[in-house]
């Protein structure tokens, strides 16, 4: 590996962060990617590995928000202990003084009266180290730092990590246009995996918006990494960045050429949303095979044979809640879809009740900061007899 690697251990403790409710889903994804020994944490999954795994997972993990590498772990009793321990670290072995940085994370400790103060202490320790070693200091950049330090304090236990992803991994790089209330890309990928879709049955989203669920479904079905269009990764700013290894990892992903094994259909009542979906699909080889129509859900072309419906219907907080829409959608599912599965995410409890169908699975999840419910319904010829009035 090129550069100075003294700062990092040979065996890395790697933490992959995810949204609440998707820990088991991320663990299953890691097993499929060749990492069977993952440990579930709160909103995260942890494994051990090497830098080749960091490069591979940043590119291939669809369900991760960010990927951290632990660089220090210690206990503290006072606020000053945090500064003293952070000041002992050889920060200049991780990144150069000309790189911008920021310190973020989570603080759950009574040691600190002000939860912002720990970040300032670590920031000062980093700046003081560079000033002592180089005579210069790195600049702090809060919004788009080149190096992002993750600080996690739980009671007296401190863990300091580097965020190898930088910007969250739901910033895929493929979205040209977003809808009014878009579903997060990592949430979309996680829902698809949680839903149990077999990647062969026709996938349909009758409220497709800007097409995120359809695109993530097509990426999964074709095996193309969701982050293949993403350019920025924070690990490129570390001293030990191995460009040759990264290029090899990336080029291997580019060689994945698999035709779409199923039909993927989308519709939306908004002409503008349909146009946005088509724009977002343009950059992919499968883009022309994904069928998008500007129609309300009950006028969309129903596919022959089994269908897997995955959708994020309009709901409150960002869009006006329309219980009548949910009731009509439930009636359409009940009477028009004779063979299939419907998977619905919504933050509207009343809207979901209005669907009027018994769910086979219910999971609490988050779409960004929105508290949502994800429900799975089995649809078949006799479903109307089981409907809830």
Where are the regions a protein language model picked out?
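Conserved S-adenosyl-L-methionine
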Residues: 183-302, 323
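C-terminal catalytic and target-recognition region of SAM-dependent MTase-like enzymes
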Residues: 295-389
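C-terminal edge-of-domain segments
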Residues: 149-165, 375, 384
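Short, charged/polar, Gly/Pro-enriched secondary-structure boundary elements
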Residues: 52-59, 167-170, 383-385
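SAM-dependent Rossmann-like transferase core, predominantly class I methyltransferases
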Residues: 160-194
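A short, flexible beta-alpha/helix-coil linker loop
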Residues: 108-111, 168, 314-318
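Non-catalytic nucleic-acid substrate-recognition regions in nucleic-acid-modifying enzymes
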Residues: 2-145, 389
